[in-house]
């Protein structure tokens, strides 16, 4: 119930856009163009603004309108010449799909061309309207849909920030459960965390699609041009967040292997895992501090037992979160990741340690640092590191 309400809350403006576009397209084709039955105008308008699509809708709308116009045109020509019938319908669908495949604009063009040809053959046979009018109606509907999207835009920033924050939340929860599982020798808890980590790909894909949709909106709508810089910044964090999720999965898998081999990492390495989880949650708060339905996970315990009393400090739960605070705490965490910490360690412990280092680099990039600057925050692992180190001095008074 609550998730349904949340979906409506995040999509209500898209519904309004689609309904308004359908009404405007029908009015324009009926009263301005004088078409007696402009069925395809509202159809193309609201289908092109599919309210449940997650991703760039302009390309989606273009493909649908192109497919509809193609199917209407092919259907009108074939059925006007050959008349209605089963084999005529088969031929119309065949020709429409072949042309759609030849154009090569994606599967939506092919499918919409075929469905429009079927519609012409069965519900709206030739002779009810002029052929060019129905093609024009489809084009008009698509253009009005894009116009409504440009003149009545929704603010893509909150949803884009929220979806990135959700992915980071899930990663933080997984790391917390892995750390607790290692501490308590609880293989089942780690296995459950690994399952959650493996299920995050859908959320990562959704994050990529929603931010791409937001970037498209600020490009199309003049009313959103002032937000282009913010969307570009969010678009830049998609890759490091994706990398972070992948690193969390590798870490969780290796933790399972460590338990199977009775090679539990040292308390210091487990502390690093907890620190990465808490730092990931801090970065999440930096992006979106608003409560969400996914605030309380269905797995594990709530991650309130953080590492702020350990060897390194993270931001207090109730304190303000700024980029400077998040970067400082990540650099302090990175400074503890000395290679000497895993001297003589097992392979599993070394892999977990290496994944923690990679996670810190990913989170620093999310906070705005370049990859080179993020890597420089780590203690070097060789005498001749590729990036000159700029490691935080742990003797400083934090």
Regions from the language model: what does each represent?
Residues 1-94, 98, 106-107, 343-347, ...:
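Alpha-helical transmembrane segments and their membrane-interface boundaries
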Residues 59-66, 107-117, 131-138, 182-185:
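A cytosolic-side transmembrane-helix exit/cap motif
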Residues 89-101, 110-124, 143:
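Alpha-helical transmembrane segments of integral membrane proteins
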Residues 104, 126, 130, 134, ...:
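Transmembrane alpha-helices and immediately adjacent membrane-cytoplasm interface residues
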Residues 225-234:
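Membrane-water interface at loop-to-transmembrane-helix junctions
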Residues 233-398:
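Soluble C-terminal extramembrane regulatory/interaction domains of multi-pass membrane proteins
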């Amino acid at each position: 119930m609550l998730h349904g309400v949340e979906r409506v809350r995040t999509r209500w403006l898209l519904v309004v856009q689609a309904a308004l576009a359908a009404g405007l397209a029908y009015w324009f084709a009926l009263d301005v163009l004088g078409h007696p039955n402009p069925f395809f105008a509202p159809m193309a308008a609201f289908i092109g603004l599919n309210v449940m699509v997650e991703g760039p809708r302009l390309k989606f709308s273009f493909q649908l309108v192109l497919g509809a116009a193609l199917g209407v045109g092919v259907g009108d020509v074939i059925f006007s010449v050959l008349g209605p019938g089963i084999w005529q319908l088969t031929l119309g669908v065949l020709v429409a799909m072949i042309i759609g495949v030849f154009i090569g604009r994606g599967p939506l063009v092919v499918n919409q061309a075929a469905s429009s040809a079927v519609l012409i053959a069965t519900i709206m046979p030739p002779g009810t309207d002029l052929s060019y009018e129905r093609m024009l109606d489809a084009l008009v509907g698509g253009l009005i849909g894009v116009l409504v999207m440009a003149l009545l835009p929704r603010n893509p920033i909150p949803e884009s920030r929220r979806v990135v924050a959700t992915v980071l939340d899930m990663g933080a929860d997984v790391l917390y459960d892995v750390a607790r599982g290692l501490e308590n020798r609880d293989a089942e808890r780690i296995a459950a965390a690994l399952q959650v980590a493996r299920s995050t790909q859908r959320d990562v894909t959704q994050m990529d699609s929603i931010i791409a949709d937001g970037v498209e909106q600020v490009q199309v709508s003049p009313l959103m041009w002032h937000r282009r810089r913010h969307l570009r910044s969010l678009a830049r964090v998609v890759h490091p967040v994706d990398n972070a999720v992948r690193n969390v999965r590798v870490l969780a898998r290796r933790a399972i292997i460590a338990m199977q081999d009775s090679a539990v990492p040292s308390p210091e390495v487990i502390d690093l895992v907890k620190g990465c989880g808490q730092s990931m949650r801090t970065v999440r708060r930096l992006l979106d501090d608003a409560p969400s339905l996914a605030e309380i996970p269905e797995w594990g315990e709530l991650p309130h037992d953080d590492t702020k009393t350990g060897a390194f400090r993270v931001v207090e739960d109730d304190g303000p979160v700024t980029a400077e605070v998040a970067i400082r705490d990540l650099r302090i965490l990175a400074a503890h990741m000395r290679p000497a910490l895993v001297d003589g360690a097992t392979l599993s412990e070394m892999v977990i340690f290496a994944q923690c280092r990679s996670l810190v680099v990913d989170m620093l990039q999310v906070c705005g640092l370049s990859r080179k600057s993020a890597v420089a925050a780590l203690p070097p692992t060789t005498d001749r590191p590729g990036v000159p180190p700029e490691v935080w001095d742990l003797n400083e008074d934090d």
